[in-house]
Amino acid sequence: MHKFLALGLLPYLLGLLNSTRLTFIGNDESDTAIALTQIVRGLQQSSLAILALPSLALSDGVCQKERNVYLDDFLQRLHRSNYKSVVFSQTELFFQHIEENLQGANECISLILDEPNQLLNSLHDRHLGHRLSLFIFYWGARWPPSSRVIRFREPLRVVVVTRPRKKAFRIYYNQARPCSDSQLQLVNWYDGDNLGLQRIPLLPTALSVYANFKGRTFRVPVFHSPPWFWVTYCNNSFEEDEEFNSLDSIEKRKVRVTGGRDHRLLMLLSKHMNFRFKYIEAPGRTQGSMRSEDGKDSNDSFTGGIGLLQSGQADFFLGDVGLSWERRKAIEFSFFTLADSGAFATHAPRRLNEALAIMRPFKQDIWPHLILTIIFSGPIFYGIIALPYIWRRRWANSDVEHLGELYIHMTYLKEITPRLLKLKPRTVLSAHQMPHQLFQKCIWFTLRLFLKQSCNELHNGYRAKFLTIVYWIAATYVLADVYSAQLTSQFARPAREPPINTLQRLQAAMIHDGYRLYVEKESSSLEMLENGTELFRQLYALMRQQVINDPQGFFIDSVEAGIKLIAEGGEDKAVLGGRETLFFNVQQYGSNNFQLSQKLYTRYSAVAVQIGCPFLGSLNNVLMQLFESGILDKMTAAEYAKQYQEVEATRIYKGSVQAKNSEAYSRTESYDSTVISPLNLRMLQGAFIALGVGSLAAGVILLLEIVFIKLDQARLWMLCSRLQWIRYDRKV
């Protein structure tokens, strides 16, 4: 009977011992101080934060007095080891100290002389659990706390120090195993009678612990985003409900991943690091963005797959997850898996009207110079001819005097009246006679020369001949030959409109041509537009003005949907996204039907994990090895090659089907004709239009000349009739 009572009270006594801390009397305080000093030194850090609060379980004054003595002794020994320490008696100041260290990415080690239950909730609520923060709880009892009573969940790093006997201390660590069960495991111990700590450093490194996950299962959000993930949704219910973000509701939505670059990457990581993964549907089937409540953005809450990471319902997230400052506040990123750039896609430059082909060789910047050359050529030619006549003028004695209409020769008068008439000779400026209407002739001569019309030599001077040769060479070998060569190239390769490949051209097209810009909802490209400066902010304002009734009408479910929108005839649409994603989706519909812009900005994609993720270092090591060995690039190229093979197979299949169908064959033939087309008279219709316009203008001028001649004849006839009447009246 007593034996059974003893067995029944044994669990109770163990629990009581487990929840009770030992008190120190006599030399126990110095032994404890020495042990804790050696334990802290085993961490190989130079600073320590100490939180010393009155314990609720040990509230008697004796223990409080002994603890003060212990704390003083511990600080004295710690400072002898050249350690920096700061002691807090208020939890708020202690939490602020940890937050400041985390913001500066500094490792912070804390020694807490209080019960864990009173601080764990605050540590989790304030997101102070991080791989850079280590919390040492001096438990003081023989056994560590039971996992049913206290659970130290990841990413919180906790060390619990127990005292099984005098001068002996055991160190338990919650991240000694990679299985994420938050159970404490013995990793080291201290024996004051022997050599002190068993091993240094005190704790196993995260790289060694998380190098092998030993079959641990991770939850990975996923949504359809080729070429990164090809997803088939087994449950098509897409409505939002109150329990949509709960883990149970998400796991019920089954998804099936059929391929993708990041799917292959995840399989390779799982094989190398020995873990399993389970795909869950990302809420909203998006990466995630900041929630908007009452028009105000909440920086502490995200939607989509990032929201699952932030709430701890997922372990990591792949699929072209772009890095941004806003996202770094909620999650962390690994070493980048893709170095990409931002870009946008539009339709391919359309073929211009062939009727204007004869005018296109002279671009807009050439026409002013050509017109000015033709305008000033005539006056320059006139100046070259007229200048010699002006230079050869000289003063000579004038022999002729004018008296009204009479001309008097002074030499003759001197001969018939010698010594009677004394006149002084008058000097005048004499010159050779300039050709009649020289300026008009020079203008028409240059015009006929540039227009390749027949014309005679205007002047026989060597200067005029030299300039005529220069004009003829310019008109024949420069203008005519260059024009002919460019016109031939225009006929061989039909001209197309200027491509929209810069942000400035896209902005001009949205303002003047009514283009619409689309972006994937809750993506990093959308964040770039919302938080960007200059042109990005202006483009975002233009996007919101596209659809007045629907301010969010510029959202698309995926980049693939946007490319499909352009392929179905959206000639006035553009899609913004990652260049690699755009390039991959463009191949599905034919790259010759789309135009990719220049690189707008550099963007990086990486594996997203929870803040303070303990295995981020191990994951980075594997990703860096894959990057340095070129495996990531090979995986991307393999995904592209696979897509090309599928596209080619689809085209061959469609070609065989269209060969049997005359209508489909005619469509294929018309499509091929837009790529390479032979020279035909349609390309020369511009010349016939110009000839028709010239003939019409000549006919109009001829009619006007006839009309004006008849009017002049009528006026002359009326004038003659009036003169005859006047003569008749005078005679009468």
From Swiss-Prot:
The chain crosses the membrane at residues 370-390, 466-486, 689-709. One of its GO terms (cellular component) is plasma membrane. Keywords: Behavior, Cell membrane, Glycoprotein, Ion channel, Ion transport, Ligand-gated ion channel, Membrane, Receptor, Sensory transduction, Signal, Transmembrane, Transmembrane helix, Transport. InterPro entries: Insect_Ionotropic_Sensory_Rcpt, Iontro_rcpt_C. GO terms for molecular function: ligand-gated monoatomic ion channel activity. The keyword Signal applies. This is Ionotropic receptor 40a.
